Structure formats: C-alpha cells, structure tokens
Amino acid sequence: MFHGLELQKVPVSYTHLTLPTTTYALSKVVAEETARHISELSGIPFVGLRLSNIFRPEDYRRVPEFWDDARLRAWNLWGYVDARDVAQAFRRALEVPTSGSQSLIIAAADTIMDRPSADLMAEVFPDVPLTRELIGRETLLAIGAARDLIGYVPEHSWTDEVAGG
C-alpha cells in the first residue's frame, strides 16, 4: 500500500494519487481541482507542490534507523525531501512563468534507504510493475515534471549528512 492505495506502477507520478483515501488527501485533491477550475476560468496560473516527507539537516541522524526494515518507510516509497530543496521548489514555483494549473511532486533524487531502489521494490512490492529500469537508489517518486516545468533539481541528500551514506 502506498498512502492507502494499491500501487499501479513505479515510479509514481502526480496522476497516480488522485483517489484519496483519507480526509487530508481528499482536501488536497479538492484544493488542486479548485485551483485548476479557477485557472481555467481566470487564466491565473497555479502550481501545486506535492511535498514528500520533509527532513531538516538535523533529522538525518535518524536515517540509519530506517534501514533494517524496508517496510517501515514503504508508506511513501522511501521518499523524502530536504527542507532546503522545498524552499527552492517554492521559490521556483513563484518565479518561473507558467500557465494553467499544474501539480508537481517535490522529492529528493534518491530514497532514504541504503540499498538500491530495485531491491526495495522486489522485497516489499514484488508484483508492482516498473515502467523502466531503476538505477541505484533513485527516487521512486517522479520528479521530472517539476524539473521540466519549474527547473526543480534537488541539491541535498541524506548522504551528505550521514557517515557511510
């Protein structure tokens, strides 16, 4: 289960999560749909940022605690994002000219785990199809749309802060 949903495929894109399973998730979908509607009627652009699990540099010391049991962090496909990269994404979303209404996944370029993403998928989600070959510890959250639309490129990783990373 990924946020209460059966995974359809990996990497997960922003279109994968449109069936909310909690009131919080429903509120996010309603907000994005409202923004889309207002944008269509008014021409006002909207960029919604779907943030992964936010980590501050001082939070990274806890990361090795996650490695023994891959299922503990599978709820969001081992995704995370550095708070400094969140700030970068918000700045870019405000400054880069856009049109229409877009929702973008904002995550780190890697997972929070110390082993390859393909191994994590084989262990925890063996029946979920992969849309392409996974390389190393790459994120399983599709951040390419954020790169393409607002120029978002994650600059920070837990590996910069944790010995042995």
Name what the model sees in each region.
Residues 15-18:
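Conserved small/polar residues in nucleotide/adenosyl-binding loops
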Residues 41-45, 56-66, 92-103:
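Glycine/proline-rich active-site loop of Rossmann-fold NAD(P)-dependent oxidoreductases
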Residues 84-165:
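C-terminal substrate-binding subdomain of Rossmann-fold SDR/epimerase-dehydratase oxidoreductases
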